[in-house]
Amino acid sequence: MQPIIRYFSFDDVTASQGWDLLSWCRSHGADDFSLTALVSPVESGRMKAFFARLDVYSKSNAVRHQLAAAPGEAAQRDTRLWRLTEQTEAILRESWGVGFVSNEYDVDLWLEDLAVYRAGDLMMGVVSHENGGVLRLTELELSELRHSSFPDRDSIPWIGF
């Protein structure tokens, strides 16, 4: 069965709703994640500490769908992954102060473009600089999310799947 594709805008979602969405994805089978870290001009102590905490949960790189790609770069590409667990979710919450549904950045710990996978397939992902994300769900899951008042849209400019 083909998943239903829905979108969400950071304008409609609070940081708390974003974290609730991550927990919801984990409770519905999401098992790993990727993210992008920007380092300028050198890696900060906070960045090193963040990745040191995640290292315990790292998985082998695998080909995964990425929503953000440079011109000429494939959407399906080798991706650094971590297991999505209660512990890694807590690390993300503690470290990513503004949350992942924000286009605000912390220069010392500049994280963006969280992507969450279920059995290797993208379930939820954001493109931070485009102010939104995508969901790939079953009809029942979409109904459940809507019942929880999570705001979804038909489309978001510059984000597609």
Question: Can you name each region flagged by the protein language model?
Answer:
Residues 1-161:
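Structured alpha/beta or helical-core interaction and ligand-binding surfaces enriched in interleaved
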